Structure formats: C-alpha cells, structure tokens
C-alpha cells in the first residue's frame, strides 16, 4: 500500500515541499534563513492577531491601548515586545537570506529572485505602517516625513500625499488605514512566500559551489528538518533574550511620548533596519533626487541578474568578487550607522561617500571584477 502522504491531495503538496524534496547534500547554514523567515512570519501573524484584539486604531486611544496591552492584558507585555523585536529578527533573517542569495548566485533563479524582491518591498511597507500604530512621537513624525516624500513626484505629488493621508495632515484617517494595511499585508506576504517557494521547487535549491547538484541529492526530511529545528531554536533563543532582557534596545525612546503635531523630535529616524536607505535618502540635497536614490537602493536588487557577468555562478571560487561583496556589507553597515546620526559635518560627507560606493559597487565594480576573473581563468 502506498503511503498516504504520497497520495492524499493535500498531504502530497506538503510531502513534496518538506519531506521527500530532493535537496543538495552540501547546503550550509546560510540556507537556514528561508525557514527562519517562515517561522518569523507565522510568529508575527500570531502575536499581531492577539495585539489587534486589544488595540484601537484611533488617534485619541491608540497610545493608551498600547499601554493597556502592556499593563492590563494577561502577558500583553510579552506579546507586544515579541511582536516589536520579532520584526527586528525578521529583518536580520531577511538581510542574511538576501546576502546569501547574492554571494552564492541564487539570482540565477530569476522568478524566485523577483518574487523575493517584491516580498522585500511588501515586508518593508508592512514594517513602516506597523511602526505608525503605537502613535508615539516617532510614529507620527516618521509617518509624516516618509509619506511626504511622495510630494516630490512632479504634478501629482501633493494630491497623492493628501490622498494617502485622507486629509491635510497625518491624522485619524491615516492611522485607521495604516492599521488596515498592517493587518492585510502579512497575509499577502504569506501568499507571496508560497509562490516564492513554488518557483524555487521548480528548479530545486542552489548550493555553495553554484554547480548543478542533480547527481547528489538527499531527502529534505530528516536531514534538513533537524537542521532547520536547530536554527529555529537559536532564533527563538535570540528573540527571547532580546525580548526579556533588553526589550527597548532597538526601539526609540521618543516613541514613549504620545504623538504631538506641535512638537518635532530632535532627530527623526526610522527603525534600525531602514537606516541604510534613510542615509542614502538624506545624502542627496534634493528632494526628488533623494527619493529616486532611496527607491533605486532597493530596486537595484531586481537588476542583479542582469549585472551578473561572471562565468561562474557562486562567489565561492572568486576572491575579487568576495572582497567586493564584503566591502558592500561593510558599506551597508556604515550607511546604517550614518542613518542614525544627526545631519552634521563628518556624518554628511561620510554618508555621501558611502552612498556613492554602494551604487558603484553593485553597478560597476562587481561586474568589472567578474569580467577580470573570467579573463584570469582564460574564459
């Protein structure tokens, strides 16, 4: 008798995706982040659902409802902090996952990569609208500053901003619609993640060498299920350490002050995971130019497959490209640091240099290094 998991219409899908899936035998721990992202997403949806049961999306009560969750709801404080720090964990996993894809040439799977870029945009949008919900000072001013960027669009800009606001400033209508977006977007992310996986399973996983591994596949279960469980335990450990020992480490103290349209915080800045893009935005002394640079800093990922000039897929055997990759990582860390600093003398120029280097590395230096490596290999 054939096993039910191979015949039942629903179980067959699960079986083909997580049990009998042929997987390369040599994928490293960098391949763990996909499953960790799935775990983060489920965790965020569940904690978010429980928070939504007690939250009120209204300018007069939003801030108080967060206080109510933390003080009066059973274990509300841990749900709230798991959700807030879970977002940070989500982005850590996301950036590691993308870095892995860039390093090992996963962008060769173009559909999977493109869905991934769309997923990144959706996750960033979700995190942004979610940050507005507590209705603290940084929530309010962050929403004002970022939505205002759309006014840089010629001709329709101002109309567009007021349409998004639902009025002439960030107010009740804005908060209500942002809550609606924040509720629906994670389910869109979930659907996109399934499509992402669907396209990945059409081709099979890449591996560190970048060489086809059809002749050396092993079943996903038990080998990688156990490996994923280890990764999940480490992620949960890190999240619990952060949530229970330093819940406000990554947050902004300004957000513990209720939103006040009459008082601007000294330094308006987004959460840490957006600081690199914020630094690029600020480094251009022109509104439209800054907005375009900001958009392009993320959208550039969609062009990575076209910028791949090497005859090899992975960077595993390409020392020049490896050096430039780690230079890009260092550059992004520099941009993240600059994004959190005030707009003053040393920071401005460092941010401008780092922004130029970011685009230069991706658009010029890495493709040229790949061509040089091809020549050295006499290809």
Curated annotation (Swiss-Prot):
CDD domains: cytochrome_b_C (cd00290), Cytochrome_b_N (cd00284)
Binding site for heme b b562: 83, 182
Cofactor: heme b
Binding site for a ubiquinone: 201
Membrane topology according to the record: Multi-pass membrane protein
A Gene Ontology BP annotation from the UniProt entry: mitochondrial electron transport, ubiquinol to cytochrome c
Disulfide bonds: none
Physiological role: Component of the ubiquinol-cytochrome c reductase complex (complex III or cytochrome b-c1 complex) that is part of the mitochondrial respiratory chain. The b-c1 complex mediates electron transfer from ubiquinol to cytochrome c. Contributes to the generation of a proton gradient across the mitochondrial membrane that is then used for ATP synthesis.
Protein name according to UniProt: Cytochrome b
Taxonomic source organism: Balaena mysticetus
Gene label: MT-CYB
């Amino acid at each position: 008798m054939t096993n039910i998991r191979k015949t039942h219409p629903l179980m067959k899908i699960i079986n083909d995706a997580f049990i009998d899936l042929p997987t390369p035998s040599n994928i490293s721990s960098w391949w763990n982040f996909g499953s960790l992202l799935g775990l983060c997403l489920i965790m965020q949806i569940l904690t978010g659902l429980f928070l939504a049961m007690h939250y009120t999306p209204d300018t007069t009560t939003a801030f108080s409802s967060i206080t109510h969750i933390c003080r009066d709801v059973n274990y509300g404080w841990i749900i709230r902090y798991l959700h807030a720090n879970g977002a940070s964990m989500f982005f850590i996993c996301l950036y590691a996952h993308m870095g892995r894809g860039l390093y090992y040439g996963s962008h060769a799977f173009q559909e999977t990569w493109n869905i991934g870029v769309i997923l990144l945009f959706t996750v960033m949008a979700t995190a942004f609208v979610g940050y507005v919900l507590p209705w603290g000072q940084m929530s309010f001013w962050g929403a004002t500053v970022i939505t205002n960027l759309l006014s840089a669009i010629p001709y329709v800009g101002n109309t567009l901003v007021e349409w998004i606001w639902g009025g002439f400033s960030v107010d009740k209508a804005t908060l209500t619609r942002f809550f609606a977006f924040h509720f629906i977007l994670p389910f869109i992310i979930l659907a996109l993640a399934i499509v992402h996986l669907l396209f990945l399973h059409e081709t099979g996983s890449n591996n560190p060498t970048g060489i086809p591994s059809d002749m050396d596949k092993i079943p996903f279960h038990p080998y990688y299920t156990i490996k994923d469980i280890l990764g999940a335990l480490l992620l949960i450990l890190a999240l619990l350490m952060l949530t229970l020992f330093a819940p406000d480490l990554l947050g902004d103290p300004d957000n513990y002050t209720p939103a006040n349209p009459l008082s601007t915080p000294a330094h308006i800045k987004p959460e840490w995971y957006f600081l690199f893009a914020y630094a690029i935005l600020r480094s251009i002394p022109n509104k439209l130019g800054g907005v375009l640079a900001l958009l392009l800093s993320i959208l550039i990922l969609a062009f990575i497959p076209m910028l791949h000039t090497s005859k090899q897929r992975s960077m595993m055997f390409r020392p020049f490209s490896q050096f430039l990759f780690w230079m890009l990582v260092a550059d992004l860390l520099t941009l993240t640091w600059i994004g959190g600093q005030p707009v003053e003398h040393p920071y401005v120029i460092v941010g401008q240099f780092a922004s130029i280097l970011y685009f230069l590395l991706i658009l010029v230096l890495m493709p040229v290094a790949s061509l040089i490596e091809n020549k050295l290999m006499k290809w």
